Amino acid sequence: MGFSETFGCISNIHSDDPSTWENKLFITFDIDWAHYDVLSDIIDVVERADVAAIWFVTRDSSLFEHLRANPKFDLWIHPNSNFLLAGETRKGATASEMIDRLIEIVPEAKDVRSHFTTQSSRLLEIFADKGSTHD
């Protein structure tokens, strides 16, 4: 297996097929606090390495079209429930609204990772209802 093939996208994992995950590395990037220039540089480095990567989306960016153009990149939603837990509604008044806002930004996203490992049966149910296949 070559260097490039060592890296995979989590959305391609099938639990019943070890070849989709055994001996693979999975790189993820959280763009939440990344400055545009830093994010652009990181994208360039990953593309030069010709490896797969997952990008966790928490806000809109003009770089998404560039990311979408690379078939080795997956865009996932990355909801931050801390606002809801603190009683703030600026990102959505409910978990469903918060997730809908992110899906508007990345409608093709089928996968999700919550911030700060905030997870619950109800959130998992909402993610699945919205089409998530991996969390």
Description of each model-found segment:
Residues 2-74:
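Active-site beta->alpha N-cap acidic-glycine motif
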Residues 128:
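Substrate-binding cleft/loops of secretory-pathway carbohydrate-active enzymes
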Residues 49-125, 133:
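Metal-dependent polysaccharide deacetylase catalytic core of the NodB/CE4 family, i.e.
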